[in-house]
Amino acid sequence: MKIVSNWIWILLLLLFTTLFQACSFNKKMTVVSAASLLEEVAKSSYKQSELRVIQKGMPAYLMLMDGMVEAWPKNERLLIAAAQGYASYASAFIEDHDRIYARTLYGKAKDYALRSLARRGFERASERSFDDFEKGLTNLRKKDVPYLFWAAANWGSWIGLNLNSMEAMAQLPRVELMMRRVLELDERFYYGGPHLFMGIWYASRPKIGGGNLKLAQNHFKRAMELGEGKFLMAHVSYAYHYARRAFDKDL
Protein backbone atom coordinates (compact mmCIF):
# COMPACT_ATOMS: atom_id res chain seq x y z
CA MET A 1 0.00 0.00 0.00
CA LYS A 2 3.00 2.29 0.53
CA ILE A 3 3.81 1.94 -3.18
CA VAL A 4 0.22 2.80 -4.13
CA SER A 5 0.28 5.87 -1.91
CA ASN A 6 3.60 7.06 -3.36
CA TRP A 7 2.32 6.69 -6.93
CA ILE A 8 -0.76 8.72 -6.06
CA TRP A 9 1.37 11.57 -4.78
CA ILE A 10 3.59 11.44 -7.88
CA LEU A 11 0.55 11.62 -10.15
CA LEU A 12 -0.92 14.53 -8.20
CA LEU A 13 2.38 16.40 -8.32
CA LEU A 14 2.56 15.93 -12.08
CA LEU A 15 -1.04 17.08 -12.41
CA PHE A 16 -0.43 20.25 -10.40
CA THR A 17 2.71 21.04 -12.39
CA THR A 18 0.92 20.56 -15.70
CA LEU A 19 -2.12 22.57 -14.65
CA PHE A 20 -0.25 25.60 -13.41
CA GLN A 21 2.06 25.63 -16.41
CA ALA A 22 -1.02 25.54 -18.62
CA CYS A 23 -2.80 28.19 -16.59
CA SER A 24 -0.93 31.05 -18.24
CA PHE A 25 -1.73 29.60 -21.67
CA ASN A 26 -5.44 28.96 -21.41
CA LYS A 27 -7.02 29.22 -17.98
CA LYS A 28 -10.54 28.30 -19.09
CA MET A 29 -9.39 25.14 -20.86
CA THR A 30 -7.31 24.17 -17.81
CA VAL A 31 -10.28 24.43 -15.47
CA VAL A 32 -12.50 22.36 -17.76
CA SER A 33 -9.81 19.69 -18.11
CA ALA A 34 -9.19 19.59 -14.37
CA ALA A 35 -12.88 19.29 -13.57
CA SER A 36 -13.26 16.48 -16.09
CA LEU A 37 -10.27 14.66 -14.62
CA LEU A 38 -11.61 14.93 -11.08
CA GLU A 39 -14.98 13.60 -12.20
CA GLU A 40 -13.32 10.63 -13.91
CA VAL A 41 -11.23 9.88 -10.81
CA ALA A 42 -14.42 9.89 -8.73
CA LYS A 43 -16.17 7.53 -11.15
CA SER A 44 -13.15 5.21 -11.18
CA SER A 45 -13.12 5.00 -7.39
CA TYR A 46 -16.68 3.65 -7.38
CA LYS A 47 -15.60 0.77 -9.62
CA GLN A 48 -12.50 -0.05 -7.56
CA SER A 49 -13.03 -3.35 -5.73
CA GLU A 50 -9.99 -2.95 -3.48
CA LEU A 51 -11.27 -0.56 -0.82
CA ARG A 52 -7.84 -0.18 0.76
CA VAL A 53 -6.56 1.44 -2.42
CA ILE A 54 -9.38 3.98 -2.31
CA GLN A 55 -8.93 4.63 1.41
CA LYS A 56 -5.21 5.27 1.01
CA GLY A 57 -5.70 7.51 -1.99
CA MET A 58 -8.66 9.60 -0.87
CA PRO A 59 -6.86 12.02 1.50
CA ALA A 60 -4.49 13.02 -1.31
CA TYR A 61 -7.43 13.32 -3.69
CA LEU A 62 -9.29 15.57 -1.24
CA MET A 63 -6.22 17.78 -0.83
CA LEU A 64 -6.04 18.08 -4.60
CA MET A 65 -9.68 19.13 -4.80
CA ASP A 66 -9.25 21.71 -2.04
CA GLY A 67 -6.32 23.19 -3.94
CA MET A 68 -8.24 23.28 -7.19
CA VAL A 69 -11.24 24.97 -5.58
CA GLU A 70 -8.92 27.47 -3.92
CA ALA A 71 -7.49 28.31 -7.34
CA TRP A 72 -10.86 28.42 -9.14
CA PRO A 73 -13.50 29.09 -6.43
CA LYS A 74 -16.30 29.92 -8.86
CA ASN A 75 -16.16 26.78 -11.00
CA GLU A 76 -19.28 24.74 -10.22
CA ARG A 77 -17.88 21.51 -11.66
CA LEU A 78 -14.87 21.64 -9.36
CA LEU A 79 -17.11 22.49 -6.42
CA ILE A 80 -19.44 19.56 -7.05
CA ALA A 81 -16.51 17.17 -7.57
CA ALA A 82 -15.12 18.27 -4.20
CA ALA A 83 -18.52 17.85 -2.55
CA GLN A 84 -18.88 14.36 -3.96
CA GLY A 85 -15.38 13.40 -2.88
CA TYR A 86 -15.77 14.51 0.73
CA ALA A 87 -19.18 12.86 1.05
CA SER A 88 -17.94 9.58 -0.42
CA TYR A 89 -14.94 9.48 1.91
CA ALA A 90 -17.09 10.22 4.96
CA SER A 91 -19.70 7.62 4.06
CA ALA A 92 -17.34 4.80 3.08
CA PHE A 93 -14.55 5.09 5.63
CA ILE A 94 -15.27 7.50 8.48
CA GLU A 95 -18.91 7.62 9.59
CA ASP A 96 -19.08 4.16 11.18
CA HIS A 97 -16.23 4.74 13.64
CA ASP A 98 -15.82 8.53 13.98
CA ARG A 99 -19.10 10.39 13.69
CA ILE A 100 -17.62 13.68 14.88
CA TYR A 101 -15.05 13.73 12.08
CA ALA A 102 -17.69 12.51 9.61
CA ARG A 103 -19.86 15.45 10.61
CA THR A 104 -17.00 17.78 9.71
CA LEU A 105 -16.49 16.07 6.35
CA TYR A 106 -20.19 16.15 5.51
CA GLY A 107 -20.26 19.80 6.52
CA LYS A 108 -17.53 20.59 4.04
CA ALA A 109 -19.27 18.51 1.37
CA LYS A 110 -22.51 20.41 2.06
CA ASP A 111 -20.81 23.78 1.80
CA TYR A 112 -19.11 22.90 -1.48
CA ALA A 113 -22.36 21.57 -2.94
CA LEU A 114 -24.39 24.61 -1.89
CA ARG A 115 -21.73 26.87 -3.38
CA SER A 116 -22.00 24.97 -6.66
CA LEU A 117 -25.78 25.32 -6.56
CA ALA A 118 -25.42 29.05 -5.97
CA ARG A 119 -23.33 29.24 -9.14
CA ARG A 120 -26.33 27.74 -10.96
CA GLY A 121 -28.51 30.61 -9.76
CA PHE A 122 -29.99 29.09 -6.59
CA GLU A 123 -28.35 31.22 -3.91
CA ARG A 124 -28.71 31.42 -0.11
CA ALA A 125 -30.44 28.04 0.12
CA SER A 126 -30.35 27.97 3.90
CA GLU A 127 -31.26 31.63 4.41
CA ARG A 128 -34.07 32.54 2.02
CA SER A 129 -37.68 32.31 3.17
CA PHE A 130 -39.34 28.93 2.74
CA ASP A 131 -41.80 30.26 0.14
CA ASP A 132 -38.98 31.83 -1.85
CA PHE A 133 -36.97 28.61 -1.47
CA GLU A 134 -39.83 26.53 -2.86
CA LYS A 135 -40.40 28.97 -5.72
CA GLY A 136 -36.70 29.01 -6.57
CA LEU A 137 -36.61 25.24 -6.98
CA THR A 138 -39.15 25.44 -9.80
CA ASN A 139 -36.66 27.49 -11.82
CA LEU A 140 -34.10 24.68 -11.82
CA ARG A 141 -33.96 22.37 -14.82
CA LYS A 142 -32.57 18.94 -15.69
CA LYS A 143 -29.12 20.38 -16.37
CA ASP A 144 -29.03 21.51 -12.72
CA VAL A 145 -29.77 18.04 -11.32
CA PRO A 146 -26.18 17.06 -10.38
CA TYR A 147 -25.79 20.21 -8.29
CA LEU A 148 -29.22 19.94 -6.70
CA PHE A 149 -28.84 16.23 -5.94
CA TRP A 150 -25.48 16.49 -4.22
CA ALA A 151 -26.52 19.58 -2.30
CA ALA A 152 -29.59 17.79 -0.94
CA ALA A 153 -27.76 14.51 -0.26
CA ASN A 154 -24.85 16.15 1.57
CA TRP A 155 -27.09 18.53 3.47
CA GLY A 156 -29.23 15.59 4.57
CA SER A 157 -26.18 13.56 5.64
CA TRP A 158 -24.89 16.49 7.67
CA ILE A 159 -28.26 16.92 9.38
CA GLY A 160 -28.28 13.18 10.14
CA LEU A 161 -25.19 13.68 12.30
CA ASN A 162 -26.59 16.80 13.97
CA LEU A 163 -29.86 15.40 15.30
CA ASN A 164 -29.39 17.21 18.63
CA SER A 165 -29.42 20.57 16.88
CA MET A 166 -32.85 22.14 16.51
CA GLU A 167 -31.42 24.56 13.96
CA ALA A 168 -30.16 21.69 11.81
CA MET A 169 -33.39 19.72 12.15
CA ALA A 170 -35.39 22.76 11.05
CA GLN A 171 -33.65 22.54 7.67
CA LEU A 172 -34.97 19.04 6.88
CA PRO A 173 -38.05 20.26 4.94
CA ARG A 174 -35.75 22.12 2.57
CA VAL A 175 -33.72 18.98 1.91
CA GLU A 176 -36.87 16.98 1.21
CA LEU A 177 -38.15 19.58 -1.26
CA MET A 178 -34.80 19.61 -3.06
CA MET A 179 -34.74 15.85 -3.53
CA ARG A 180 -38.37 15.77 -4.64
CA ARG A 181 -37.45 18.30 -7.30
CA VAL A 182 -34.60 16.03 -8.41
CA LEU A 183 -37.10 13.18 -8.73
CA GLU A 184 -39.30 15.34 -10.92
CA LEU A 185 -36.42 16.33 -13.18
CA ASP A 186 -34.45 13.08 -13.48
CA GLU A 187 -35.24 10.04 -11.35
CA ARG A 188 -32.45 8.09 -13.07
CA PHE A 189 -29.63 10.34 -11.95
CA TYR A 190 -26.72 8.58 -10.24
CA TYR A 191 -28.14 5.05 -10.67
CA GLY A 192 -31.50 6.05 -9.19
CA GLY A 193 -29.87 7.99 -6.35
CA PRO A 194 -32.92 10.20 -5.68
CA HIS A 195 -35.03 7.09 -5.01
CA LEU A 196 -32.34 5.66 -2.74
CA PHE A 197 -32.33 8.89 -0.76
CA MET A 198 -36.11 8.90 -0.39
CA GLY A 199 -36.09 5.21 0.57
CA ILE A 200 -33.72 5.97 3.43
CA TRP A 201 -35.73 9.11 4.21
CA TYR A 202 -39.00 7.22 4.74
CA ALA A 203 -37.45 4.14 6.37
CA SER A 204 -35.38 5.97 8.97
CA ARG A 205 -38.15 8.19 10.34
CA PRO A 206 -40.83 7.18 12.84
CA LYS A 207 -44.38 7.00 11.55
CA ILE A 208 -45.39 10.04 13.56
CA GLY A 209 -42.57 11.97 11.89
CA GLY A 210 -43.55 11.08 8.35
CA GLY A 211 -41.98 7.63 8.11
CA ASN A 212 -43.65 5.17 5.77
CA LEU A 213 -42.20 1.70 5.19
CA LYS A 214 -44.33 1.00 2.13
CA LEU A 215 -43.15 4.16 0.40
CA ALA A 216 -39.61 3.37 1.50
CA GLN A 217 -39.80 -0.07 -0.07
CA ASN A 218 -41.16 1.35 -3.32
CA HIS A 219 -38.30 3.84 -3.56
CA PHE A 220 -35.66 1.23 -2.73
CA LYS A 221 -36.99 -1.16 -5.36
CA ARG A 222 -37.09 1.59 -7.97
CA ALA A 223 -33.51 2.56 -7.12
CA MET A 224 -32.36 -1.05 -7.54
CA GLU A 225 -34.25 -1.28 -10.83
CA LEU A 226 -32.67 1.89 -12.20
CA GLY A 227 -29.24 0.87 -10.94
CA GLU A 228 -29.38 -2.38 -12.93
CA GLY A 229 -27.18 -4.10 -10.38
CA LYS A 230 -24.35 -1.57 -10.81
CA PHE A 231 -24.98 0.31 -7.57
CA LEU A 232 -24.65 -2.08 -4.64
CA MET A 233 -25.31 0.69 -2.13
CA ALA A 234 -29.01 0.47 -2.99
CA HIS A 235 -29.13 -3.21 -1.99
CA VAL A 236 -27.10 -2.59 1.17
CA SER A 237 -29.28 0.34 2.20
CA TYR A 238 -32.46 -1.62 1.48
CA ALA A 239 -31.35 -4.36 3.85
CA TYR A 240 -29.96 -2.00 6.48
CA HIS A 241 -32.65 0.68 6.60
CA TYR A 242 -35.79 -1.13 5.44
CA ALA A 243 -35.36 -4.75 6.54
CA ARG A 244 -34.45 -3.84 10.11
CA ARG A 245 -37.60 -1.78 10.46
CA ALA A 246 -39.82 -4.29 8.65
CA PHE A 247 -38.26 -7.32 10.41
CA ASP A 248 -37.83 -9.09 7.06
CA LYS A 249 -34.98 -11.51 7.73
CA ASP A 250 -35.00 -12.81 4.15
CA LEU A 251 -33.61 -9.54 2.77
Residues covered by each model-derived region:
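Sec-dependent N-terminal signal peptides of Gram-positive bacterial secreted proteins and lipoproteins
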Residues: 14-15
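Alpha-solenoid helical repeat scaffolds
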Residues: 80, 193-196, 232-237
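Hydrophobic face of amphipathic alpha-helices that form TPR/SEL1-like repeat modules
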Residues: 155-158, 197-204, 241-242
